[in-house]
Amino acid sequence: MSDAWLVVGLGNPGAEYERTRHNVGQMVLDELASRTRGSFKRHRTGARTAEVRLGVAPGGAPGPRVVLAAPTSYMNVSGGPVAGLAKYFDVDVEHLVVVHDELDVPFGSVRLKRGGGEGGHNGLRSISKSLGDKDYARVRVGIGRPPGRQDPADFVLKEFSSTEKKDMPFLVMDAADAVEELVIKGFEAAQQKFHAPA
C-alpha cells in the first residue's frame, strides 16, 4: 500500500449545484487545493484530482502526500469513482477521508467519525458498498436540519441562507483544518481537537 492519503469531497456535478449544502465537501477540497496551490485535472476514474503535500509534518518536513478528489458523478453513485481512485492510487481504507455535508451536526460545526453507519447519507452508502468496507474516516461538515417540515432531500439541494453564507468561509476553513490535522497528526488527535468544547 502507498503512504499517500485520498481525501474525497462529496458533491454533485454542474453549476446549478456548486453552492448548495450538498456540495460543501467539494468547497472544502477547493480550500485545501488553494492552500497548497494544487490544480485539479480530470482523472480516468471519473473524478477531478489534485496531488498535493498537505501542511507541515512535525520537525518542519513537508506534510504527507495527499490526493484531493472530487467525483464527477452524482453523489448517490460516487462509490464507483472512490473505489477506483483508492485502487489506482493504492490507498488503503485507513488512509481514506471523505468530507461531506451532515444534517445531524449543527450548522457551523465540524465532527470526525471513523466507520459506522451512513446516517441516511446516500453518498456514504454508495462508497461503503463499492469499497465493501465502512472503516474510512469522515469529516462531517454541519449543515443542520431543515426548518419546519421541509424535506431534507430538498434542503440539501438548496443554497445556504444569506445569514449562513456570511459564516461559510469559517466553516469551510475549519473543515479544511480538520482534514489537515487528521492526515498529519492522526484521527484521534484531530477528533479530540474538533470535538473539544469551545
UniProtKB/Swiss-Prot annotation:
Keyword Repressor on entry: no
Membrane as UniProt keyword: no
Pfam hit, one: Pept_tRNA_hydro
Single GO molecular function: peptidyl-tRNA hydrolase activity
One Gene Ontology term, aspect cellular component: cytoplasm
Similarity annotation: Belongs to the PTH family.
Subunit structure: Monomer.
Record-given protein name: Peptidyl-tRNA hydrolase
Lineage: Bacteria, Bacillati, Actinomycetota, Actinomycetes, Kineosporiales
Gene name as annotated: pth
